[in-house]
Amino acid sequence: VLSSQYSSLEYLDGMNFEVDNETFTLQLVHFLANDFPTDVQELGSLTGVLIDSFDTSALSKAQIRCLTSWVTAGGSLFVGTGTGAEVVLSGLDHLLKVQAGDVEEVQYTFKSELSRAGSARLYTSGLTFAEEDKWESLSLSSPACVYREKYESGEISVFTFSLTDDTFRQWTGRDDVVGEIFEEELREEAGRSWVGDTSLWYVKTTLYAFMNGRHPNTFYYGIFFIVYLG
């Protein structure tokens, strides 16, 4: 995940989820965008990348190619839009083929299984999908707020709102909805043979390489999240 509003996403750090009798914890790693890799091998065993409230035009062509290759090989990309949709999508046109539209407040009613969710009024971007037949809307809310596409061996999810939205962050149903958004990826994570001490060491080693290559005066910030068994 890349974000210029890291502090507004800190609520995700340490969030626990129960999926298929397994406990998962989201752990955020904050890094500078200039350190986003250009070699897909440097992404190692990261479970997912979230881009939210970030100007993707700041990424180089080599970084975009790396991200695309990582998703193609089986990675999961999550993209938050909302009021920042235009800048978030600006550098991802070739990968997503999604255009930002007008932003308006939309009242979402979430499915009854999300006991604490109920409804929420969120700033929402109208999204236009050039390849609409490749996307499916999740049966999470009415109207739909999450769209998902299978991309080769990987997966891309686009939200009509931003996870940095103040209303969403303060909403009592927040954690339930976040869990639903990431549930499929977490379930796949539970079945991956590399989840264990050895793979966790590999992830930490990869992150160590990122952290030792930082440039201190870069304006854009980001986060990677790692999901591991608790």
Q: Which positions does each model-derived feature cover?
A:
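A glycine-rich, often tryptophan-bearing local segment used as a flexible ligand/cofactor-contacting loop or short
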Residues: 56-142
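Aromatic-Pro/Gly-enriched surface loop or interdomain linker
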Residues: 1-54, 81-83, 187-191
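Short catalytic/ligand-binding loop motif for oxyanion handling, primarily in non-cytosolic enzymes
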Residues: 9-10, 85-89, 166-168
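A glycine-centered loop/beta-turn motif at secondary-structure junctions
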Residues: 45-48, 73-77, 126-229
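Ser/Thr- (and often Asn-) enriched beta-sheet segments in non-cytosolic proteins
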Residues: 27, 99, 107-109, 148-150, ...
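A short acidic, often aromatic-flanked loop/helix-cap motif at beta-alpha or helix-coil junctions
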Residues: 34-41, 103-106, 144-146, 166
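Short secondary-structure boundary/capping segments
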Residues: 15-19, 92-97, 173-175
